[in-house]
Amino acid sequence: MERMLLLSPPSLAARPERLNTILSSHSRYATDLQMLDRVAAGLVSLPQSTYDIVMLLTDVDGLGTGSTSAMGRGVIQSVVRALRPGGKFKRENGTFPSTECPDNTELMLAGLVFDDTGGLLKPDFGPENIVPLKLGKRKPVHSVSSNGTGTSGPHVNMQLSTGSMLKGQTTTIKGVGFVDFTDDPSLSEADIYSGQTDDELIDEETLLDGEDMGRPIIQPPECRPKAGKRRRACKDCTCGLAERLREEDKAARAKADATLETMKLAPKELAEVDFTVQGKLGSCGNCALGDAFRCDGCPYIGLPPFKPGEEVRLLSNDVQL
């Protein structure tokens, strides 16, 4: 019994009486019904090589424009896979247009062909057969035997069961040929791999003259400094910006190191202040000169100038100016 698949456009879903009329004219045991929009959306997958006939139903208006517009490439490929070899794909209201119609391009690209009745047919190429390929006979190789006579036939390495060669016959095993890519065939292999050849080496510096060396270096736009930002060199800078920035950083680092060297104090230049012993001065040496010359953390802040080592006394807790 032939299996049939009915593809219904979405407009027939609102007319159940129309669907019942169509289904009543076909066998319910061998007929399946699928909505075209669900197949196009991928919600329904059609079984492969199952149906002998796939019929595309028309719309409610009978024109078939809705069903034709929903037949995309994915739906056509699903229909072709669902057809058995030799199966037919046809429309309810008649045949498909001629092969010159642009709407049939996807149908023909999917592998369907037009039959005599105007429908589309999936070709049946029959079962796959294995075709043996016969190789031609090997051409005989002409060789010269030990006695000087020419012989023809395949070059066979003949050996006895004991592994010894036949007396009076010598065989030569042909190896794999190598291709020599050198231009000079007179060079030995050692000279080629060692690089000792007569080829003249060209110094790159001789290719530039004084005029070329004096030309200004054209700086690419991406290497030019931007306003408010420090210039940065590219990763593979060739305009000299990387070397210039490296020299500037080196000079700035040397200047900072020189400044730090002048600020360093030797151990002999450091003095420890002990305020419990009279006659000791601070490391700045300005403690006795007054507040104008004292440091922020000096313990003598607020006291009048005094001589080093002199005991200062304030009478009646009055500040002496």
From Swiss-Prot:
Subcellular location: Cytoplasm; Mitochondrion intermembrane space
Region (Fe-S binding site B): 284-298
Region (Fe-S binding site A): 223-239
Residues the record lists as binding [2Fe-2S] cluster: C223, C234, C237, C239
A single cellular component GO annotation: mitochondrial intermembrane space
Linker as annotated region, ranges: 132-213
The entry's keywords: 2Fe-2S, 4Fe-4S, Cytoplasm, Iron, Iron-sulfur, Metal-binding, Mitochondrion
Binding site for [4Fe-4S] cluster: C284, C287, C295, C298
Co-factor(s): [2Fe-2S] cluster; [4Fe-4S] cluster
Motif (Cx2C motif 1): 284-287
Entry similarity comment: Belongs to the anamorsin family.
Listed name of the protein: Fe-S cluster assembly protein DRE2
Upper lineage: Eukaryota, Fungi, Dikarya, Ascomycota, Pezizomycotina
